[in-house]
């Protein structure tokens, strides 16, 4: 999300922006709305054939047009890159859709209308596009052909700088000089020291039967591994990752699709989307389970401490 708005890729429903200004307001009955008033004066939707993912440059409620020359000279602010004005949406059939989202940062409630600024799929390169993340002024996209690198220094004129053929690639996350990806064969590593020319790291694979999404936290990669639960992989040496442990909570994790890591006080927690089996909460470190919990990157000692069923499949 950015500011008071939640951005969503809704598959056949396209790309939509929800108003979540009242998400913590107990006096409001409907806290997530498509429009705070009549949709005749607010249309935060861009239709597409199969929107799969999106990326924005920051979650801060920035408004680049306010970054004027006066602000740069008198207040000594840096100029803002043009990519901060856009949302980059992947669509499995249409490729890349670029949408200007500045309207949600200008403070004017009368002009909240979205439209495409660009639709791009040169020679079908982005057919099957299903995941995107920004790394500086580059966009890394997962598509049927593998990992596609686009230079988006000019967001409305993307330039292909690299294509790495990776069969069955699903998702990825970046940390410093490396990109860790999941595919139908497990976890792999790509060197992105030169962001424009990623290089596949040979002999870096960790075999997993059903690696889905992943999250990186210091020296560990947490990989959602479907019916096998959670794979925790040591990435202290990023070009030689090693499986640390598999965890399914004695059969409680049965359809693990995604995980996000967070810290509360001195304990590490994992928030797990467990597919057909709802939401699961893991405690990864605590004073009782891991005596070294105050260390920089203690070995996780996962345990399921909470869960919530869902009427539909929880994917992320």
Model segments located where?
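Feature marking well-ordered beta-strand scaffolds used for ligand recognition
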Residues: 1-316
């Amino acid at each position: 999300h950015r500011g008071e708005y939640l951005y969503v890729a809704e598959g056949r429903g396209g790309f939509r922006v929800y108003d979540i200004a009242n998400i913590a307001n107990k006096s409001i009955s409907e806290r997530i709305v498509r429009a705070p008033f009549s949709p005749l004066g607010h249309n935060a939707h861009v239709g597409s054939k199969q929107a799969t993912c999106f990326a924005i440059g920051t979650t801060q409620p920035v408004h680049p047009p306010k970054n004027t020359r006066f602000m740069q000279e008198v207040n000594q602010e840096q100029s803002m890159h043009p990519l901060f004005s856009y949302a980059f949406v992947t669509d499995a059939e249409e490729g890349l859709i670029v949408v200007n989202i500045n309207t949600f940062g200008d403070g004017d409630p009368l002009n909240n209308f979205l439209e495409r600024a660009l639709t791009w799929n040169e020679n079908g390169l982005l057919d099957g596009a299903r995941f995107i993340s920004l790394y500086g002024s580059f966009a890394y996209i997962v598509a049927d052909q593998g990992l596609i690198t686009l230079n988006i220094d000019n967001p409305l004129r993307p330039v292909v700088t690299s294509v790495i053929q990776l069969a069955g690639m699903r998702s990825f996350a970046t940390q410093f000089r490396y990109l860790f990806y999941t595919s139908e064969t497990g976890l792999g590593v790509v060197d992105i020291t030169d962001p424009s020319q990623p290089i596949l790291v040979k002999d870096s694979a960790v075999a997993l039967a059903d690696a889905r999404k992943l999250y990186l936290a210091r020296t560990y990669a947490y990989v959602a591994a479907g019916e096998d639960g959670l794979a925790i992989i040591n990435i202290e040496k990023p070009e030689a990752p090693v499986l640390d442990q598999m965890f399914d909570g004695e059969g409680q994790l049965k359809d693990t699709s995604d995980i996000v890591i967070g810290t509360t006080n001195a304990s590490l927690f994992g928030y797990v989307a467990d597919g057909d089996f709802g939401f699961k909460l893991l405690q990864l470190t605590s004073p009782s389970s891991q005596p070294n919990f105050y260390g920089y990157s203690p070995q996780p000692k996962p345990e399921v401490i909470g869960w919530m069923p869902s009427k539909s499949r929880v994917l992320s």
